[in-house]
Amino acid sequence: GNSFTLISPTSNEGSWETPYELDKNNPSVIYAGYDELYKSIDGGNSWNIITNSITNGGNIDEIALSKSNSDIIYISDNSNIYRTSDGGLNWIQINNNLPSKYITYIIVHPADENKVWVTFSGYTAGEKVYRTIDGGQNWINISGALPNIPINCIEHDNTSNLETVYIGTDLGVYISDSTTNIWNQFNNNSLPNVIINELEIQYQSNRLFAATFGRGLWSIDLEITSPPIANFSYSDSV
């Protein structure tokens, strides 16, 4: 941290939050989303474009890599989502029955690259969270009775046999699993009803961390088996 080197692949402007993703299977491989998806295999010293103008000039907003197969990548631009299964040589659009809303987040199951969750912004009731088990050929609406607020992020609990997922909304954190479309608020009056921008699970401590818009960083023990009983603690620094 004493010095930094600029490794941006292009002088073009990206999205407000330009996505970068590190391949967990090879830390020298980095992906960056601008008007194209850029890939580096040498830690950012050089970059190659692995999309062919599939976004028609739009910026790539989200990148999700499969941990089980590095050739499988999902990206989105605004309301469109794309998949490659050969490392970027060929891409297919997999919107199918998804709503034409802004995609805020994509996550891929760590052991099954065909299981994917996407979340949406906006204020259209019942169009918040979708899941696929076949790589995007078909999408299942799992929004249930979520309140009509934007969903900003989603995190999968890799320790859960029920494929538990947490979502960050404009009014805190909610939890559900693959067996139901029932969402429970995971705040319990400890975490303020505030915008959640990012969720991350720290498995060494078995805790979920929630980054808020203007209210700091909060953490909580992961849900085990009982209904959510949340007891957030506050950290003043990220």
Located regions from the model:
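Proline- and Ser/Thr-rich low-complexity, intrinsically disordered segments
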Residues: 223-238
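Extracellular glycan-interacting surfaces
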Residues: 1-227
